[in-house]
Amino acid sequence: MYAVFQSGGKQHRVAEGHTVRLEKLEVATGDTVEFDQVLLVADGETVHVGAPLVAGGKVVAEVVSHGRAEKVTIVKFRRRKHHDKKMGHRQWFTEVKITAINA
Protein backbone atom coordinates (compact mmCIF):
# COMPACT_ATOMS: atom_id res chain seq x y z
CA MET A 1 0.00 0.00 0.00
CA TYR A 2 1.30 3.46 -0.86
CA ALA A 3 0.04 7.04 -0.77
CA VAL A 4 0.86 10.43 -2.25
CA PHE A 5 0.51 13.36 0.14
CA GLN A 6 1.38 17.04 0.10
CA SER A 7 3.60 18.81 2.62
CA GLY A 8 5.61 22.00 2.32
CA GLY A 9 4.39 22.64 -1.22
CA LYS A 10 5.77 19.31 -2.46
CA GLN A 11 4.22 15.92 -3.12
CA HIS A 12 5.70 12.76 -1.65
CA ARG A 13 5.02 9.10 -2.55
CA VAL A 14 5.39 6.93 0.55
CA ALA A 15 4.67 3.48 1.91
CA GLU A 16 4.58 2.26 5.51
CA GLY A 17 8.07 2.06 6.97
CA HIS A 18 9.61 4.58 4.56
CA THR A 19 11.73 7.44 5.87
CA VAL A 20 11.23 10.77 4.08
CA ARG A 21 12.87 14.20 4.32
CA LEU A 22 10.30 17.01 4.33
CA GLU A 23 10.53 20.77 4.57
CA LYS A 24 11.10 21.80 8.19
CA LEU A 25 8.16 21.17 10.54
CA GLU A 26 7.89 22.82 13.95
CA VAL A 27 7.42 19.50 15.77
CA ALA A 28 9.65 17.96 18.45
CA THR A 29 11.69 14.84 17.75
CA GLY A 30 9.78 11.68 18.68
CA ASP A 31 6.34 13.29 18.25
CA THR A 32 3.67 11.98 15.90
CA VAL A 33 2.44 14.10 13.01
CA GLU A 34 -0.59 13.53 10.77
CA PHE A 35 -0.84 14.64 7.15
CA ASP A 36 -4.43 14.98 5.92
CA GLN A 37 -3.69 16.39 2.45
CA VAL A 38 -3.66 12.94 0.82
CA LEU A 39 -3.92 13.06 -2.97
CA LEU A 40 -3.83 9.34 -3.80
CA VAL A 41 -4.04 6.02 -1.94
CA ALA A 42 -3.37 2.68 -3.62
CA ASP A 43 -3.29 -0.88 -2.37
CA GLY A 44 -2.74 -3.99 -4.48
CA GLU A 45 -5.73 -3.73 -6.81
CA THR A 46 -7.60 -0.48 -6.07
CA VAL A 47 -6.48 3.11 -6.49
CA HIS A 48 -8.33 5.99 -4.80
CA VAL A 49 -7.59 9.32 -6.48
CA GLY A 50 -8.80 12.47 -4.75
CA ALA A 51 -10.51 15.40 -6.39
CA PRO A 52 -8.34 17.08 -5.11
CA LEU A 53 -8.08 15.17 -1.77
CA VAL A 54 -9.03 11.62 -0.78
CA ALA A 55 -11.96 11.74 1.66
CA GLY A 56 -10.84 10.43 5.04
CA GLY A 57 -7.28 9.90 3.86
CA LYS A 58 -4.53 10.34 6.42
CA VAL A 59 -0.81 9.58 6.62
CA VAL A 60 0.63 9.19 10.13
CA ALA A 61 4.37 9.64 10.72
CA GLU A 62 6.86 9.86 13.57
CA VAL A 63 9.49 12.62 13.59
CA VAL A 64 12.95 11.03 13.54
CA SER A 65 15.25 14.06 13.35
CA HIS A 66 15.79 17.62 12.19
CA GLY A 67 18.80 18.78 10.21
CA ARG A 68 20.23 20.75 7.35
CA ALA A 69 20.79 19.51 3.81
CA GLU A 70 24.04 19.66 1.85
CA LYS A 71 25.20 23.12 0.86
CA VAL A 72 24.07 24.46 -2.51
CA THR A 73 26.58 26.91 -4.00
CA ILE A 74 25.38 29.82 -6.12
CA VAL A 75 27.78 31.85 -8.29
CA LYS A 76 26.78 35.09 -10.01
CA PHE A 77 29.09 37.02 -12.27
CA ARG A 78 29.13 39.84 -14.81
CA ARG A 79 31.14 39.25 -17.92
CA ARG A 80 34.21 41.39 -18.56
CA LYS A 81 33.73 43.37 -15.30
CA HIS A 82 35.90 41.40 -12.82
CA HIS A 83 32.78 41.01 -10.70
CA ASP A 84 31.68 37.75 -9.18
CA LYS A 85 29.67 36.78 -6.14
CA LYS A 86 29.60 33.39 -4.44
CA MET A 87 26.85 32.41 -2.02
CA GLY A 88 25.75 29.23 -0.29
CA HIS A 89 22.53 27.93 1.22
CA ARG A 90 21.64 24.99 3.48
CA GLN A 91 17.94 24.16 3.70
CA TRP A 92 16.43 22.90 6.99
CA PHE A 93 14.58 19.57 6.82
CA THR A 94 12.59 17.24 9.06
CA GLU A 95 13.05 13.50 8.66
CA VAL A 96 9.93 11.43 9.36
CA LYS A 97 9.16 7.70 9.36
CA ILE A 98 5.76 6.70 7.98
CA THR A 99 3.90 4.54 10.51
CA ALA A 100 0.39 4.26 9.03
CA ILE A 101 -1.64 5.04 5.91
CA ASN A 102 -5.43 5.32 6.30
CA ALA A 103 -7.81 5.63 3.37
Curated annotation (Swiss-Prot):
PROSITE patterns: RIBOSOMAL_L21. GO terms for biological process: translation. One of its GO terms (molecular function) is structural constituent of ribosome. It comes from the Bacteria. One of its GO terms (cellular component) is ribosome. Signal peptide: none annotated. The keyword rRNA-binding applies. The keyword Ribonucleoprotein applies. Pfam families: Ribosomal_L21p. Keywords: Ribonucleoprotein, Ribosomal protein, RNA-binding, rRNA-binding. NCBIfam families: L21 (TIGR00061). Belongs to the bacterial ribosomal protein bL21 family. PANTHER family: 50S RIBOSOMAL PROTEIN L21 (PTHR21349), LARGE RIBOSOMAL SUBUNIT PROTEIN BL21M (PTHR21349:SF0). This protein binds to 23S rRNA in the presence of protein L20. Part of the 50S ribosomal subunit. Contacts protein L20. This is Large ribosomal subunit protein bL21. It comes from Shewanella sediminis (strain HAW-EB3). The lineage of its organism: Bacteria, Pseudomonadati, Pseudomonadota, Gammaproteobacteria, Alteromonadales.
